[in-house]
């Protein structure tokens, strides 16, 4: 997948259905991306790179597309895939995963079962046992990788405003969150909108 030359919004859509693999020391975790958010850098008031701000914690966001930007929010580890060329702080937040391999270990790691295991940006990273130290690593050159060949394809994609970013003017309302329609592993999914996971893919 080209993380440098494509538009960040398009990358966020293209990532839906892509297989994520995390190889721990004794356990392999896999699942399919069902929810993403695009963050558009310098002009995006909700982005960590807004206005060109650089601090030690966001250094990875300014690296070349394909870098992993991992940051902690409210004690939860959030994983972003950096996009664009070095120096342009854009990226895609991976918000939710439909789990596949390593389910029993995920249940242990999370202390939860069912859709709650991976239906949020801090939930799936805890389920996969991903450490903060992965920040700055290159996707597919470390324990975290994606498989764009053995993937799924959404039947429908819904675009909506991003979660949890009030008071950012127009950026609060821009439809930069992308979800697999009806997939029950999407965060904040209403039960009435849920479908069986297998019915949400082509």
From Swiss-Prot:
What EC number(s) is this enzyme filed under? 3.2.2.-
Keyword line: DNA damage, DNA repair, Hydrolase
Main EC class of this protein? hydrolase
Q: Which GO terms describe its molecular function?
A: alkylbase DNA N-glycosylase activity; DNA binding
BP terms from Gene Ontology: base-excision repair
Q: Which domain of life is it from?
A: Bacteria
Query: Which protein family is it in?
Result: Belongs to the DNA glycosylase MPG family.
What is this protein's record name?
A: Putative 3-methyladenine DNA glycosylase
Organism field: Staphylococcus aureus (strain bovine RF122 / ET3-1)
Q: What is the lineage of its organism?
A: Bacteria, Bacillati, Bacillota, Bacilli, Bacillales
